[in-house]
């Protein structure tokens, strides 16, 4: 009988007899014996995790709700980049609450991700159309980091320029994040007034400028002349724009913007006490190859049909490493999909209507307040009014509060009110009366814009078919379902991606994210209104600190890569404070994730590679040599544990000692934390800082490429250098727009830890290890396991080596991954960390039946490869090279292949019961990059051309 709640037995796949069979196959009697032979004894935890006992699903939900009920939910019109929204129920129910959408992985395998890819193309089209710039990416983390990425983009476009101007009317949190990013990159940030700044005074050293549109105080400005003067110096112009405002006011592309960034939260996404939200970026065609993040493009499949794919991937961190455009990996795909569905559902006319209604309600409030004698400073506005109330700002905020509303205190003399689509005429009347101190007439009867005609948008947007076809709920529901059916997610099959930890995202964990108590708070509400969510975040931080063995944890980073960057910044700021700011060398093993060198470069560090030996372990002699050679300038080492080769390296504590002895800090990449929890921890090993991927180890879903949270845990000496924020009273080191990053979805991990308890968490780690070793044992005689520990065992993942087979058969590792789609699986991680190999991570959640199904598929694929090698199957026209096979392919009237239709589509009998069909055939990546298409209008033209 389990000593913990029954949730752990529902989360963990193999139970009872299945475990015994798996252990027997490995030659072990108990799980404890297996773990003892895998995890080095000198790093094992001496005591169980000091966490509360597991609760049932019902108990955990009740406890969390009781905590979150301590929040006070008022109507909030603070603005500053965050607004009340209405998520259409059809989108909430069929997308946000649907595991078919939230459990998928990043769409690196386009043949089984066409649904998400289509919606991301819709997202890009929406952004491009609204901003008036031809190219947009498929989301970034938040507006602050998007602005920081734009600064880097400008600098890369003009590498000899070291100065960047930021208008002082940008959102304060954005300015903080930019300052953090610039601190160790040698960029001089000037914050000032656009009207008095002379670009010519900086000249060739000016990389670019950033303005807010409308600005943080609500003013709509015409930047045409300013941008002309900036362009005269050769610098670039960046606009942080509100997409909802762009439905009715002039698009940035019309007045000379080179880059546009912002947040799509206004498009139906709850505020979430700061997140998650999908940021966006668009740019001119000339800058597209410098753009960070994922870019969706169009190509063709083997039948010549149009197919979506990730384009221009050579810009990304997993390929270019420290030379990448950014360290961005996980972004905000699910939120981008939600925002795009919002635009699809409302269409151009619906969006324009919402934008117009917001503005006219704001104008009605303007009219009521001015009639009551309250001065409004901005005459050209969209949704925000700047109240001039000398010495009375605090009193105004208090009056609004007493009436049930939050408004923004700008300074002692000014307050601001930002309305949104949730504002009603009753709200306007109540707010006006409260601020005026008497009953005030505030009829919603305005019918003309309050801005000068020059600011009115003249161009149409979102005219493409996708935005003009699905405006009834029936049509929308079916469109969502059609797209979902094109993607393989965890509700369909195991996703055995190594280093990705695609474990169960349980329904109970997901329930709280739609509670108003969790998702409707503005991140800048008074502290007494957010007691509940801050208590939840504090509990989560404390539990993560105990799990990692660290003194403190910051939840601010919005993704794992952001956590890496934040951790490195903590080290650099600590060293600078200690008078060792010259330390700028980062040692990184050659097996490391691509984000490691990319993050190091962002933190202003020089990357020095460390070799690995023939067994895949870090070459300790080379490490010692490099550490000693760079001891005067050594900042840190970045090390993943267990290693990216799937092995618990026996020398990890020695590694930490060597680095520390030479003046460096140890940064541990927490990507493989799923093999540590409850058995060991970064603090036990000797690390100084570690980031966690809550969307891996702690059960947060991947969302098809985000959202994620990448908190960092640090040792005592680094605690003062955790990320700050304006709302925390110290802004230095801010890496996100909100103090707690994507706060609302932290509830998922709170639930996971509460329901698993210390015993369940340890057992999950042990079972992840057992599952990986079971697969390695069953497949190792066909596909050699490339690296293993001293006793031939692996950690929580294993690298299968098909290189001799693929060489002899004239195949590639891609052929195996694509063929797995015919068997109903997402392929494992390909060619990382070793080219031509497959890295498999089954996680603890997969039952033995699913593991056996995967093993059977790989055994059959081995037989198919062998048939090619011995001449039984054709070397060119075979099931592997032609995979994946679509329903259209196998049902065609003509069949000219030397293998049968059933061999193509139903290679094992289990597929006769249930079959997942790839929506398109193999996608031509080269064609897609040579014929880059990134918006729907050009997709429609492209499709017609392909048909011709």
From Swiss-Prot:
Family: Belongs to the GcvP family.
Enzyme class: oxidoreductase
GO cellular component, one term: glycine cleavage complex
N6-(pyridoxal phosphate)lysine: modified positions: 696
Designated name of the protein: Glycine dehydrogenase (decarboxylating)
Quaternary organization: The glycine cleavage system is composed of four proteins: P, T, L and H.
Domain of life: Bacteria
Cofactor(s) the record lists: pyridoxal 5'-phosphate
GO MF annotation: an example: glycine binding
Purpose of the protein: The glycine cleavage system catalyzes the degradation of glycine. The P protein binds the alpha-amino group of glycine through its pyridoxal phosphate cofactor; CO(2) is released and the remaining methylamine moiety is then transferred to the lipoamide cofactor of the H protein.
Cited SUPFAM superfamilies: PLP-dependent transferases
Keywords in alphabetical order: Oxidoreductase, Pyridoxal phosphate
InterPro entries, per the entry: GcvP, GDC-P_C, GDC-P_N, GDC_P, PyrdxlP-dep_Trfase, PyrdxlP-dep_Trfase_major, PyrdxlP-dep_Trfase_small
Catalytic activity: N(6)-[(R)-lipoyl]-L-lysyl-[glycine-cleavage complex H protein] + glycine + H(+) = N(6)-[(R)-S(8)-aminomethyldihydrolipoyl]-L-lysyl-[glycine-cleavage complex H protein] + CO2
Enzyme Commission number(s) from the entry: 1.4.4.2
GO BP terms in the entry: glycine decarboxylation via glycine cleavage system
């Amino acid at each position: 009988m389990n000593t913990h709640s029954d949730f752990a037995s529902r989360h963990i796949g193999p139970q009872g007899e299945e475990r015994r069979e798996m252990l027997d196959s490995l030659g072990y009697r108990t799980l404890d014996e297996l773990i003892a032979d895998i995890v080095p004894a000198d790093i094992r935890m001496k005591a169980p995790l000091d966490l509360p006992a597991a609760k049932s699903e019902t108990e955990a939900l009740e406890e969390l709700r009781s905590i979150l009920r301590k929040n006070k939910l008022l109507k909030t019109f603070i603005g500053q980049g965050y607004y009340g929204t209405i998520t259409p129920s059809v989108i909430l129910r069929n997308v946000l609450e649907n595991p078919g959408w939230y459990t998928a992985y990043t769409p690196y395998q386009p043949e089984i991700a066409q649904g998400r890819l289509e919606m991301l193309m819709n997202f890009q089209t929406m952004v491009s159309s609204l901003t008036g710039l031809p190219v947009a990416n498929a989301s970034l983390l938040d507006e602050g980091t998007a602005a920081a990425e734009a600064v880097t983009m400008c600098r890369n476009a003009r590498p000899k320029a070291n100065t960047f101007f930021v208008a002082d009317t940008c959102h304060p949190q954005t300015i903080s994040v930019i300052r953090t990013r610039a601190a160790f990159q040698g960029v001089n940030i000037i914050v000032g007034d656009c009207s008095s700044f002379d670009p010519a005074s900086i000249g060739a050293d000016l990389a670019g400028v950033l303005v807010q549109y409308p600005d943080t105080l609500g003013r709509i400005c015409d930047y045409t002349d300013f941008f002309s003067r900036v362009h005269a110096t050769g610098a670039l112009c960046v606009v942080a724009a509100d997409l909802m405002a762009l439905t009715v006011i002039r698009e940035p592309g019309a007045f000379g913007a080179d880059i546009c960034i912002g947040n799509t939260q206004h498009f139906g996404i709850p505020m979430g006490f700061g997140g998650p939200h999908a940021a966006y970026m668009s740019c001119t065609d000339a800058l597209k190859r410098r753009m960070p993040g994922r870019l969706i493009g169009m190509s063709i499949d083997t039948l010549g049909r149009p197919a979506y794919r990730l384009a221009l991937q050579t810009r990304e961190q997993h390929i270019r490493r420290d030379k990448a455009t950014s360290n961005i990996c996980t972004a905000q795909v699910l939120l981008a999909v939600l925002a795009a569905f919002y635009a699809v559902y409302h269409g151009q006319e619906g969006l324009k209507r919402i934008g117009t209604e917001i503005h006219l309600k704001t104008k009605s409030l303007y009219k009521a307040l001015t009639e009551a004698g309250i001065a409004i400073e901005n005459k050209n506005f969209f949704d925000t009014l700047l109240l001039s109330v000398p010495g009375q700002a605090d009193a105004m905020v208090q009056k609004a509060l007493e009436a049930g509303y939050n408004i923004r205190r700008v300074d002692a003399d000014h307050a601001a009110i930002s309305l949104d689509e949730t504002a009603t005429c009753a709200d306007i009347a109540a707010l006006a009366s409260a601020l005026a101190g008497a009953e005030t007439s505030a009829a919603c009867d305005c019918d003309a814009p309050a801005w000068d005609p020059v600011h009115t948008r003249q161009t149409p947007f979102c005219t493409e078919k996708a935005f003009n076809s699905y405006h009834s709920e029936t049509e929308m529901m079916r469109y969502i379902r059609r797209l979902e059916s094109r993607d393989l997610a965890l509700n369909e099959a195991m996703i055995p991606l190594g280093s990705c930890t695609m474990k169960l995202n349980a329904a109970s964990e997901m329930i709280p994210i739609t509670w108003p108590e969790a998702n409707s708070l503005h991140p800048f509400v008074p502290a007494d209104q957010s007691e509940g969510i801050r208590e939840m975040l504090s509990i989560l931080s404390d539990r993560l600190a105990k799990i990692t063995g660290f003194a403190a944890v910051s939840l601010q980073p919005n993704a794992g890569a952001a956590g890496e960057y934040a951790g490195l910044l903590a080290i650099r700021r600590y060293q600078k404070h200690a008078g060792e700011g010259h330390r700028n060398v980062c040692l990184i093993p050659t097996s490391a994730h691509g984000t490691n060198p990319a993050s190091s470069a962002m933190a202003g560090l020089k990357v020095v590679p460390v070799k690995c030996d023939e067994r895949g372990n870090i070459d300790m002699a080379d490490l010692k040599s490099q550490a000693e050679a760079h001891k005067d300038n050594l900042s840190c080492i970045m090390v993943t544990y267990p290693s990216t080769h799937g092995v618990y390296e026996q020398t990890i504590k020695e590694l930490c000692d060597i680095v520390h002895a030479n003046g460096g800090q140890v940064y541990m990449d927490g990507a493989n934390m799923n093999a540590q929890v409850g058995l060991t921890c970064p603090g036990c090993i000797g690390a100084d800082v570690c980031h966690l991927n809550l969307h891996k180890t702690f059960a947060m879903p991947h969302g098809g490429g985000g959202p994620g949270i990448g908190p960092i845990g640090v040792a005592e000496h680094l605690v003062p250098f955790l990320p700050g924020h304006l709302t925390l009273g110290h802004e230095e080191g801010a890496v996100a727009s909100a103090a707690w990053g994507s706060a609302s979805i932290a509830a998922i991990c709170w639930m996971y830890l509460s329901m698993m308890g210390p015993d369940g968490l340890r057992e999950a780690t042990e079972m992840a290890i057992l599952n990986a070793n079971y697969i390695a044992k069953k497949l190792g005689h066909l596909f050699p396991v490339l690296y293993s520990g001293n006793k031939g065992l692996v950690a929580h993942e294993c690298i299968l080596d098909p290189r001799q087979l693929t060489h002899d058969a004239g195949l590639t590792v891609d052929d195996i991954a694509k063929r797995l789609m015919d068997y109903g699986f997402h392929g494992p991680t390909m060619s990382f960390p070793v080219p031509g190999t497959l890295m498999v991570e089954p996680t603890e959640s997969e039952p033995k039946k699913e593991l056996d199904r995967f093993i059977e598929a790989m055994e059959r694929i081995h037989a198919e490869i062998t048939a090619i090698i011995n001449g039984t199957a054709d070397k060119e026209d075979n099931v592997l090279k032609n995979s994946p096979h679509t329903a259209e392919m196998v049902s065609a009237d003509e069949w000219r292949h030397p293998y049968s239709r059933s061999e193509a589509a139903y290679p094992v009998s289990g597929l006769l019961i249930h079959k997942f069909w790839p929506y398109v055939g193999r996608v031509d990546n080269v064609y897609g990059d040579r014929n880059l298409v990134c918006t729907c209008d050009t997709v429609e033209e492209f499709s017609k051309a392909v048909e011709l």
